[in-house]
Structures are given as structure tokens and as C-alpha cells.
């Protein structure tokens, strides 16, 4: 399973990566997890080799997660898209790009 984590905050990427690796290793699921600090770099990589799952922060420097998701959907309609954010303000926009889940960073800490 090829997974992308797109977030401009390194600590957030590392935290999510560690959680994912822990969960998947317990289930003996092989994953290839790649991290990107901005939407532009991620989109370039996604065009070369698509991802199965994409965790995408909405609030990033440069292009935001909504714009990145819209661009992604032009070339990849199949990946599971999960927004990571501390706010639900953009939930409706998330559904417009077929995001399956709005994952809030605060909820993961509970």
C-alpha cells in the first residue's frame, strides 16, 4: 500500500507516520509511506506513481490542501483522500473532492 502524507509541519508528518506504521505493522500490512512538505512536490510524485491513500493537510504554506486535492482529482480519481486538519471549516469542500474522511489532528490525541 502506497501512502502519502502531505503537511508543511514536519512534526505532524512524523506523528502521523508513526501512528500509521504502528497500526499497519500490527496487522502485518506492508506499506510504503512517503512524506511531502507541500502540495506541489506531492503532485509531481503522484503523477509519476499514484498513491493508494493520501493524508492531506488543508492549511499549508503555498497551495492549500483543497487546491491540491482538486488538482489531484484531475489525474487520480481512485485514491482514498483523507484531510488532516485542526478545523472542520472546510468539510463541505472536502466532500466536493471526494475526500472520504475529515480527520482532525486534535481527535488523534484523545
Predicted stretch roles:
Residues 7, 57-58:
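Active-site residues of response regulator receiver
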Residues 9-34:
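Two-component/phosphorelay signaling modules centered on CheY-like receiver
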Residues 35-53:
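Acidic, metal-coordinating helix/loop segments flanking the phosphotransfer/catalytic sites
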Residues 38, 64-67:
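Acidic catalytic/metal-coordinating carboxylates
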Residues 57, 78-88:
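A short, hydrophobic beta-strand element within the central beta-sheet of small alpha/beta folds
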Residues 61:
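The feature encodes the CheY-like receiver
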Residues 103-109:
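Conserved small/polar residues in nucleotide/adenosyl-binding loops
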Amino acid at each position: 500500500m502506497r501512502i502519502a502524507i502531505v503537511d508543511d509541519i514536519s512534526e505532524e508528518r512524523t506523528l502521523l507516520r508513526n501512528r500509521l506504521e504502528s497500526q499497519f505493522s500490527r496487522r502485518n500490512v506492508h506499506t510504503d509511506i512517503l512524506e511531502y512538505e507541500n502540495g506541489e512536490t506531492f503532485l509531481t510524485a503522484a503523477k509519476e506513481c499514484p498513491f493508494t491513500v493520501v493524508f492531506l493537510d488543508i492549511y499549508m504554506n503555498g497551495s492549500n490542501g483543497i487546491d491540491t486535492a482538486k488538482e489531484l482529482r484531475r489525474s487520480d480519481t481512485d485514491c482514498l483522500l483523507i484531510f488532516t486538519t485542526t478545523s472542520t471549516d472546510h468539510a463541505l469542500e472536502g466532500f466536493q473532492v471526494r475526500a472520504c474522511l475529515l480527520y482532525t489532528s486534535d481527535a488523534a490525541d484523545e
